[in-house]
Amino acid sequence: MSDQHDERRRFHRIAFDADSEILQGERRWEVLLHDVSLHGILVGQPQDWNGDPQRPFEARLYLGLDVLIRMEISLAWARDGLLGFECQHIDLDSISHLRRLVELNLGDEELLERELALLVSAHDD
């Protein structure tokens, strides 16, 4: 990716390996999670991908036997075998799990608080 793209990025991506799936209506795809942020996810495009980019999706990230992150997402872009999704909504339990995951990986609570403030302001616009 270009330096300009990296400069525009406001949310740190966390490389993370978790069983993950994307759902849309009755359709379901198991996906390889490349990274996650407070803003969305990046996954490998499944071979049988036929999602409708005009309709919402749901992401499910299984972090363990009893930890699930669920997000309502929209497809932001698709290229080079990757799908970039933007988070549109996340429930309280899921954002708590995601916040903890990001906090552990960033190692900087102040940076996490700035990203959370950016997330809130982005959704208020």
UniProtKB/Swiss-Prot annotation:
Disulphides: none
Subunit composition and interactions: Monomer in both c-di-GMP-bound and free forms.
Cell membrane among keywords: no
Keyword hit for Cytoplasm: no
Domain PilZ, chain residue ranges per copy: 7-103
Native source organism of the sequence: Pseudomonas aeruginosa (strain ATCC 15692 / DSM 22644 / CIP 104116 / JCM 14847 / LMG 12228 / 1C / PRS 101 / PAO1)
Protein name: Cyclic diguanosine monophosphate-binding protein PA4608
Motif (DXSXXG motif): 35-40
SUPFAM superfamilies registered for this protein in UniProt: PilZ domain-like
InterPro entries: C-di-GMP_BP_PA4608 (IPR027021), PilZ_domain (IPR009875)
Source taxon at top rank: Bacteria
Residue window of motif RXXXR motif: 9-13
Pfam families, per database record: PilZ (PF07238)
Effect ascribed to mutating residue 13 to A: Abolishes c-di-GMP binding
Keywords in alphabetical order: c-di-GMP, Nucleotide-binding
Main function: Binds the second messenger bis-(3'-5') cyclic dimeric guanosine monophosphate (c-di-GMP). Can bind two c-di-GMP molecules per monomer. May play a role in bacterial second-messenger regulated processes. Binding to c-di-GMP induces a conformational change of the C- and N-termini resulting in the exposure of a highly negative surface on one side of the protein to a possible effector protein.
Entry comment, domain topic: Consists of a six-stranded anti-parallel beta-barrel core structure with an unstructured N-terminus in apo-form and a C-terminal alpha helix. In the holo-form the C-terminal helix is displaced by the ligand, thereby opening one side of the beta-barrel as a binding site, and the N-terminus containing the RXXXR motif wraps around the ligand and in turn ties the C-terminal helix in a loose conformation. The structural rearrangement upon ligand binding creates a significant change in surface charge distribution.
UniProt site positions, description: Important for c-di-GMP binding: 40
Molecular function in Gene Ontology: cyclic-di-GMP binding
Binding site for 3',3'-c-di-GMP: 6-13, 77
